[in-house]
Amino acid sequence: MSYTRTSAGVVVVTVVAAVIAGCSGSSSGIQSGSGSAVSSASPAQPSPAPTESNPPGDIPDNQVYVTYRPTSGFTGFTVKVPEGWARTDKGATTVFTDKLNSVRITTAAASAAPTFASVTNTVVPQLRTQVPNFASPKVTQVTRHAGQVVLLTYQGDSAKDPVTGKVVRDAFERYAFYRQGHEVDLTLSGPVNADNVDPWRTVSDSFAWR
């Protein structure tokens, strides 16, 4: 009989231990699973949209253009210029400016159309004396909506900023339009690192005789 009680006690202890171990293991598994579920259920936070900013001198892609029609001097042409730019008139020259960029329009009587040779031999030497650190002149003939035009590209320093004292290295595009004894020089300028290819094409393509 003593043997039977001992055996039963062993069986009971063994069963209880197994139940406790099973509960302990089951509890551990639930905690682990619960932890993983909470972690995977956390929604990813969306990244904020980057703020768009243009390099200094870049004309915005959404820039609006308006038609300039001169009312004095030679008035036989029109050209589109960026809306909102400040305008200055001095003699036969009208300038539109905004920060680091400018559109300069100069009219003059001319007995002959400008050529590669005339711009190279006459205009370039004049600009060397007028533009600080004038450099890299290149004369070509290009086509715009108004027809064939002589284009002079070059670089030079801007005027010193009266507030900051800074000087900007500028790139220039000078288009010489001609018709029936009248020449209109359209000069577009801005910082050399600015990407204004499209805006300047819009302006130069908009030139029209009337």
Predicted regions and their residues:
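N-terminal targeting sequences that direct proteins away from the cytosol to non-cytosolic compartments
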Residues: 2-101, 180, 187-210
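Short amphipathic beta-strand/extended segments with alternating polar/hydrophobic composition
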Residues: 79-81, 106-107, 164-166
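Sec-exported extracytoplasmic/periplasmic mature domains
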Residues: 86, 125-132, 157, 205-209
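A short acidic-to-branched-hydrophobic micro-motif
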Residues: 97-122
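Short, isolated positions in well-ordered beta-strands
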Residues: 103, 149-150, 184
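Solvent-exposed loop/turn segments at secondary-structure junctions
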Residues: 111-113, 158-159, 183, 190-194
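Extracytoplasmic/secreted proteins, especially bacterial periplasmic and envelope-associated proteins
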Residues: 118, 122, 126, 199-202
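Signature of long, low-cysteine stretches enriched in small and polar/charged residues
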Residues: 128-177
